[in-house]
């Protein structure tokens, strides 16, 4: 591992690291915020997954999460949104390829060689964080848009791994919206049954009641992608039918930007703290 940057921030440290990923077959960067140490108890971790076109720095720089994370004693880990590099398959569109990994394991060429973000987030990155930093094994997950999709599927596919999950403007039903259909067709092929494994609505309908964890979703009602790409009401209905403890908040006037995330990130951190710090 190689440290790329380090900055003092709210008495803690904001760092950026590069490491060679055996899962993704390329070097990867991630950012981490380490709150000021309190006692000998290792702090819990909140993983943040960003959206299309982003990398590990968007949330770090724009969301303003460090102040409250420092107060609460929560480590923030921000991975990249895809594998990177000249040897990694890419596409000219912003919504496929590098910067658009969709947090799944691709099965189709040319993507399958590198695009295994799900395995990276489930196994390799948490193991690296555990081995290199003083953190507890308690963790939660959150994300925005494509990253909200990622956070939800990570939680739904891994019962017991996360204490809680939250999302801002998530893509909840990728099997049925243009962003998801384009990505899944390329990464997973034309068998739509294979897509269901990566769709949070389908996963929620298939979930067991004992695996449900507290879930918070914020969605701006002035989001230009709300009707065509996001459709949170579809997941809310699945949650209702499965008695999943999910709160969906529609925030008047807010759009899809980091101004929206910055406005409510404190709520999300305090939400996760209730369960991480038990």
From Swiss-Prot:
Name of the protein in its database record: S-formylglutathione hydrolase YeiG
Job description of the protein: Serine hydrolase involved in the detoxification of formaldehyde. Hydrolyzes S-formylglutathione to glutathione and formate.
Family: Belongs to the esterase D family.
Domain of life assignment: Bacteria
InterPro entries noted in UniProt: AB_hydrolase_fold (IPR029058), Esterase-like (IPR000801), S-formylglutathione_hydrol (IPR014186)
Keyword flag Transport: no
A GO BP annotation: formaldehyde catabolic process
PANTHER family named among the record's database cross-references: S-FORMYLGLUTATHIONE HYDROLASE, S-FORMYLGLUTATHIONE HYDROLASE YEIG
Reactions mediated catalytically: S-formylglutathione + H2O = formate + glutathione + H(+)
Active-site residue list: 145 (charge relay system), 223 (charge relay system), 256 (charge relay system)
Keyword Hydrolase applies: yes
Enzyme class per UniProt: hydrolase
Pfam families with a match to the protein in the record: Esterase
Signal peptide coordinates: none
EC number: 3.1.2.12
A single GO cellular-component term on record: cytosol
Molecular-function GO terms, alphabetical: carboxylic ester hydrolase activity; S-formylglutathione hydrolase activity
Keywords noted in UniProt: Hydrolase, Serine esterase
């Amino acid at each position: 591992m190689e440290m790329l940057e380090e900055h003092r921030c709210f008495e803690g440290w904001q760092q950026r690291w590069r490491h060679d990923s055996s899962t993704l077959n390329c070097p990867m960067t991630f950012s981490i915020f380490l709150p000021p140490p309190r006692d000998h108890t290792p702090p819990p971790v909140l993983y943040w997954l960003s959206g299309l076109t982003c990398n590990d720095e968007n949330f770090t720089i724009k969301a303003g999460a460090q102040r409250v994370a420092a107060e609460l004693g929560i480590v923030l880990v921000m991975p990249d949104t895809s594998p990177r590099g000249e040897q990694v398959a890419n596409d000219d569109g912003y919504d496929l390829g590098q910067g658009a990994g969709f947090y799944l394991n691709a099965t189709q060429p040319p993507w399958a060689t590198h695009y295994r973000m799900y395995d990276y987030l489930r196994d390799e990155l948490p193991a690296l964080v555990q081995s290199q930093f003083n953190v507890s094994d308690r963790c939660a997950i959150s994300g925005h848009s494509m990253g909200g999709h990622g956070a939800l599927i990570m939680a739904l596919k891994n019962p017991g791994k996360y204490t809680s999950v939250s999302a801002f403007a998530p893509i909840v039903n990728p099997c049925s919206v243009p962003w998801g259909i384009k990505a899944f067709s390329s990464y997973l092929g034309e068998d739509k049954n294979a897509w269901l494994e990566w769709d949070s609505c389908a996963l929620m309908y298939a979930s067991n009641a004992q695996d449900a964890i507290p879930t918070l979703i914020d969605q701006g009602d002035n989001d230009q992608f709300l009707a065509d790409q996001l459709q949170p009401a579809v997941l809310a209905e699945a949650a209702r039918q499965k008695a999943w403890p999910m709160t969906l908040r529609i925030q008047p006037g807010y759009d899809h930007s980091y101004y929206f995330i910055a406005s409510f990130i404190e709520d999300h951190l305090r939400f996760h703290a209730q369960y991480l710090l038990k």
